[in-house]
Amino acid sequence: MGAYKYLEELAKKKQSDVNLFLSRVRAWEYRQMNVIHRASRPSRPDKARRLGYKAKQGYVIYRIRVRRGGRKRPVPKGQTYGKPVHQGVNHLKYQRSARCTAEERVGRYCSNLRVLNSYWVNQDATYKFFEVILVDPSHKAIRRDPRINWIVNPVHKHRESRGLTSIGKKSRGIGKGHRYNNSPQHATWLRHNTLSLRRYR
């Protein structure tokens, strides 16, 4: 069993003494830093690698904190100018997750980079902390790598703002619901009985 497996098991048990101590110390450390700052390396390397991160040139990790809680409707003096049923201001729930917000803010901050994915790292009473994996589309190491150079294509600019990242698709409900529950029997049979020699193994 490799080292990443141990890290994964450690991360699962949030109430363990090690994790509680680490999260408390790290939350304090992250609060002292800027809202968006570059991390020298991922604080969860196993998770980052599963989501596509590689420790090589062209890949960057940014850490961000997002305030917890609902979203207040941005109306002046609480005047919504509508029927009473639509006059709510305070107890409204934002339909996208905090991780979506984190990706969007980092994407705007680093507008020359492309957002690949993100993951949760910590939270306290006020904030949630996320790390966002970004890729430099103009770096030669990225442009020459056939596994990641799809992101160089201009259609992938600001994919986080259009709900095309993993969490963005989840917020849009893609891959969920009655259409996805029962996969066709023929497709399953074909998948299990087809020899597929992939380029990367």
Curated annotation (Swiss-Prot):
GO terms for biological process: cytoplasmic translation. One of its GO terms (molecular function) is RNA binding. SUPFAM superfamilies: Ribosomal proteins S24e, L23 and L15e (SSF54189). Its main location: cytoplasm. Component of the ribosome, a large ribonucleoprotein complex responsible for the synthesis of proteins in the cell. The small ribosomal subunit (SSU) binds messenger RNAs (mRNAs) and translates the encoded message by selecting cognate aminoacyl-transfer RNA (tRNA) molecules. The large subunit (LSU) contains the ribosomal catalytic site termed the peptidyl transferase center (PTC), which catalyzes the formation of peptide bonds, thereby polymerizing the amino acids delivered by tRNAs into a polypeptide chain. It comes from Schizosaccharomyces pombe (strain 972 / ATCC 24843) (Fission yeast). Pfam families: Ribosomal_L15e. It is found in: Cytoplasm; Nucleus; Nucleus, Nucleolus. Residues 161-182 are annotated as: Disordered. InterPro entries: Rbsml_eL15_core_dom_sf (IPR024794), Ribosomal_eL15 (IPR000439), Ribosomal_eL15_CS (IPR020925), Ribosomal_uL23/eL15/eS24_sf (IPR012678). Belongs to the eukaryotic ribosomal protein eL15 family. The keyword Zinc-finger does not apply. One of its GO terms (cellular component) is cytosolic large ribosomal subunit. This is Large ribosomal subunit protein eL15B. It comes from the Eukaryota. Component of the large ribosomal subunit (LSU). Mature yeast ribosomes consist of a small (40S) and a large (60S) subunit. The 40S small subunit contains 1 molecule of ribosomal RNA (18S rRNA) and at least 33 different proteins. The large 60S subunit contains 3 rRNA molecules (25S, 5.8S and 5S rRNA) and at least 46 different proteins. The gene is rpl1502. There are 2 genes for eL15 in S.pombe. Residues 169-179 have a biased composition (Basic residues). The modification Phosphoserine is found at residue 183. The keyword Phosphoprotein applies.
